Amino acid sequence: MAVPKKRTSISKKRIRKQIWKRKGYWISLKAFSLGKSLSTGNSKSFFVQQNK
């Protein structure tokens, strides 16, 4: 017979949600930083051809 799982506590749910949000925040910050460096031409990790 199937037994229902215990309910996840609110605090645990909040902690997991914050971790998930924090990961997204850092990824978006890195992406924004990379885009900024590409647009200004200061990128050291990408070689972008400039149209003359």
From Swiss-Prot:
Alphabetical list of InterPro entries matching this protein: Ribosomal_bL32, Ribosomal_bL32_plant/cyanobact, Ribosomal_zn-bd
Compartments where located: Plastid, Chloroplast
Entry keyword set: Chloroplast, Plastid, Ribonucleoprotein, Ribosomal protein
One matching Pfam family: Ribosomal_L32p
Biological processes per GO annotation: translation
Cellular component aspect of the GO annotation: chloroplast; large ribosomal subunit
GO molecular function, one term: structural constituent of ribosome
Major localisation: plastid
Superkingdom in the source lineage: Eukaryota
Family affiliation: Belongs to the bacterial ribosomal protein bL32 family.
Protein's UniProt name: Large ribosomal subunit protein bL32c
Taxonomic source organism: Aethionema grandiflorum (Persian stone-cress)
